[in-house]
Amino acid sequence: MKAPFRIGQGFDVHALVPGRALIVGGVHIPFERGLLGHSDADVLLHALTDALLGAAGLGDIGRLFPDTDAAHAGADSRVLLREAFAAVRAAGFGVVNVDATVICRAPRILPHAPAMVANIAADLGIDAAAVNIKGKTTEKLGFTGRGEGIAAQVVALLMRHGDET
């Protein structure tokens, strides 16, 4: 018997560096530094993509969009998310809900969370009420606490198509 529900967990980290735009959850956030990465380095969307792919048993973002492929250089992570989600849907799953935590000293996430929620809901074709985003600090501990980078953790619940009640 195939399980009607699948849970995926995603995690990502990127360093904050000068000279890059800061994009989190598809939102451009005014800040003096941005995230370093092969694509736009959207730490939240990368963790979400991993959570969705993992729940569906489809690997991870690095397998689908390797950083060794020049085609993904500077890529918009919302485009990557939509492509990954198309594979998840093709595997027979839809999203029930997403719960995410963005961990950083600065900038503050809460003022930008509604726009992030709207982007994710639109990209996944789900109600905004099914997406939750929290911002947390580590009380000045570790690399996020020192402001050296941003981390994100995401849990996603998928439901197999045809199992709707």
UniProtKB/Swiss-Prot annotation:
Pathway involvement of the protein, from the record: Isoprenoid biosynthesis; isopentenyl diphosphate biosynthesis via DXP pathway; isopentenyl diphosphate from 1-deoxy-D-xylulose 5-phosphate: step 4/6
Subunit structure: Homotrimer.
Keywords attached to this entry: Isoprene biosynthesis, Lyase, Metal-binding
Single GO MF descriptor: 2-C-methyl-D-erythritol 2,4-cyclodiphosphate synthase activity
Positions annotated to bind a divalent metal cation: D12, H14, H46
Record-listed 4-CDP-2-C-methyl-D-erythritol 2-phosphate binding positions: 12-14, 38-39, 60-62, 65-69, 143, 146
Protein name (database record): 2-C-methyl-D-erythritol 2,4-cyclodiphosphate synthase
Needed co-factor(s): a divalent metal cation
GO biological process per UniProt: isopentenyl diphosphate biosynthetic process, methylerythritol 4-phosphate pathway; terpenoid biosynthetic process
Keyword Transport: no
Superkingdom, natural source: Bacteria
Site (described: Transition state stabilizer): H38, T137
HAMAP family named among the record's database cross-references: IspF (MF_00107)
Family assignment from sequence similarity: Belongs to the IspF family.
Gene for this chain: ispF
Protein task: Involved in the biosynthesis of isopentenyl diphosphate (IPP) and dimethylallyl diphosphate (DMAPP), two major building blocks of isoprenoid compounds. Catalyzes the conversion of 4-diphosphocytidyl-2-C-methyl-D-erythritol 2-phosphate (CDP-ME2P) to 2-C-methyl-D-erythritol 2,4-cyclodiphosphate (ME-CPP) with a corresponding release of cytidine 5-monophosphate (CMP).
The protein's Enzyme Commission number: 4.6.1.12
